[in-house]
């Protein structure tokens, strides 16, 4: 009895409040895959040379640079999802439905961070690995 109570408390601690955590996971959709990418200075400009001002647009350009233009940073990893143009077009909507802290968004827009992107069926989460 004592160990099962401890286990429940431990699970609630790591997961927030049990049912809330399950709901959040369901809201994201099923997990697809993850990748890491360095968002370098060239990822902050579109193919017309115009400056990008949103985190989603910068991440999308990183994937276009990777797959379309062959412009890859040493830390960039492949993913199967955003290799397709039509899926890259969904990136902004997916980030709106997903998660990224204001600190992560600021680091992307104002710097050249190394990020991790977790891709789900309907959303994505972006975390900062290093600035």
Q: Could you say what each language-model-derived stretch is?
A:
Residues 8-17:
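Bacterial N-terminal signal peptides
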Residues 1-9:
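Bacterial N-terminal signal peptides that target proteins for export
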Residues 26-63, 113, 123:
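Charged, low-complexity intrinsically disordered segments
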Residues 26-27, 97-111:
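Short, solvent-exposed secondary-structure boundary motifs
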Residues 106-130:
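Short, exposed beta-strand-loop hairpins at the edges of beta-sheets
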Residues 18-27:
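Sec/Tat signal peptide C-region and signal peptidase I cleavage site
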Residues 5, 43, 86:
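Solvent-exposed, flexible loop/coil residues
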Residues 49-104:
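Mature extracytoplasmic domains of secretory-pathway proteins
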């Amino acid at each position: 009895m004592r160990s099962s109570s401890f286990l429940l408390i431990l699970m609630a601690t790591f997961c927030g409040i049990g049912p809330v955590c399950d709901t959040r996971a369901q809201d994201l959709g099923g997990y697809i895959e993850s990748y890491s990418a360095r968002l370098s200075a060239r990822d902050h400009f579109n193919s017309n040379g115009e400056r990008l001002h949103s985190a989603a647009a910068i991440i999308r350009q990183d994937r276009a640079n990777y797959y379309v233009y062959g412009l890859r940073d040493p830390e960039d990893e492949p993913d199967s999802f955003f290799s397709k143009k039509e899926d890259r077009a969904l990136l902004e909507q997916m980030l709106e439905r997903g998660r990224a802290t204001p600190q992560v968004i600021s680091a992307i827009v104002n710097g050249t961070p190394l990020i991790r992107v977790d891709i789900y069926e309907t959303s994505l989460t972006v975390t900062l690995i290093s600035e």
